[in-house]
Amino acid sequence: MRAIISLLLISAMVFSIIEAVPEEEGLQLSEDERGGCLPHNRFCNALSDPRCCSGLRCKELSIWDSRCLG
């Protein structure tokens, strides 16, 4: 009987925590997660997403440094 009551209390607490977070907040994604583009002078990788914004290209400045430049 105690186990059932404890389980019900834990379920109620978890549900109240989930309801406390607004739905819109949980759906907001960062620019990178949405597959957006990278602005000027940001680190990039020409072989993987996200890509540089239109008008910019991922230019290799050295072996370890590539940036979105115009």
From Swiss-Prot:
Gene Ontology molecular functions: toxin activity
Residues recorded with modification Leucine amide: L69
Keyword presence, Phosphoprotein: no
Tissues in which the UniProt entry reports expression: Expressed by the venom gland.
Propeptide residue span(s): 21-34
Main location: secreted
Pfam families with a match to the protein in the record: Toxin_7
Subcellular location: Secreted
Keywords: Amidation, Disulfide bond, Knottin, Neurotoxin, Secreted, Signal, Toxin
GO cellular component, one term: extracellular region
UniProt key word Signal: yes
Family the UniProt entry places it in: Belongs to the neurotoxin 01 (U2-agtx) family.
Domain notes per entry: The presence of a 'disulfide through disulfide knot' structurally defines this protein as a knottin.
Function of the protein: Insect active toxin causing rapid but reversible paralysis in crickets. No activity shown in mammals. Does not show effect on mammalian voltage-gated calcium channels.
Name assigned to this protein: U2-agatoxin-Ao1l
